[in-house]
């Protein structure tokens, strides 16, 4: 539908069963076509930690990925009003993918001085999924989930909503993508990787 042809990204989270089997995270990048020629998948070999593969654009350090310790990350840009000096998200993603344990991956985001807001969706090989909504100076963590969940480019946590920039023209499109993804996820009895495509 033409209603969804606006740049942005949407993440999907599907919790697994009690053993963690079937847990999934996914993301689409509805970016301007100008980025298509710069899209790359990179394998990073690390002597001091896990190797990782990640999706990014040429010149960036990483936007989404998975390491060989089973830690995965996808992201959604958020637009808080408290941006300032701090660590930018590509370095956060690299810190997440350098982690061996999910708790360390969470700390790679929450224990650092952040430059701005981002939504980080983390998952490990045991099926643990954590959604980290952040601003430069605050955060909220969602886990466990009551079924599948979607996230786009606006804050979902009530406590963080006042931090969102007031004059942000793409908010409506973000709400639209989030609503559509949420409805589609709820319409599938047990979402799997094929259904998320």
Where do the PLM segments sit?
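C-terminal, well-structured catalytic/ligand-binding subdomain of enzymes
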Residues: 1, 16-24, 28-197
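Active-site pocket-lining segments that scaffold enzyme catalytic pockets across diverse folds
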Residues: 1, 5-10
């Amino acid at each position: 539908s033409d209603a969804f042809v606006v740049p942005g990204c949407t993440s999907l989270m599907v919790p697994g069963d009690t053993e963690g089997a079937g847990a999934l995270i996914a993301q689409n990048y509805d970016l301007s076509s100008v980025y298509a020629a710069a899209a790359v998948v990179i394998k990073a070999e690390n002597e001091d930690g896990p190797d990782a593969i990640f999706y990014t654009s040429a010149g960036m350090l990483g936007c989404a990925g998975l390491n060989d310790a089973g830690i995965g990350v996808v992201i959604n840009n958020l637009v808080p009003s408290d941006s300032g000096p701090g660590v930018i998200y590509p370095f956060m993603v690299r810190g997440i993918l350098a982690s061996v344990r999910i708790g360390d991956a969470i700390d790679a985001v929450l224990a650092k001085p952040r430059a701005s807001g981002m939504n980080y969706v983390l998952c490990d090989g045991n099926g643990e999924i954590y959604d980290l909504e952040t601003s430069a100076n605050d955060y909220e963590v969602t886990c466990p989930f009551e079924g599948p969940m979607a996230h786009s480019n606006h804050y979902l946590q009530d406590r963080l909503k006042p931090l969102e920039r007031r004059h942000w023209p793409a908010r409506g499109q973000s709400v639209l993508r989030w609503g559509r993804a949420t409805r589609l996820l709820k319409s599938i009895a047990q979402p799997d990787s094929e259904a998320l495509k």
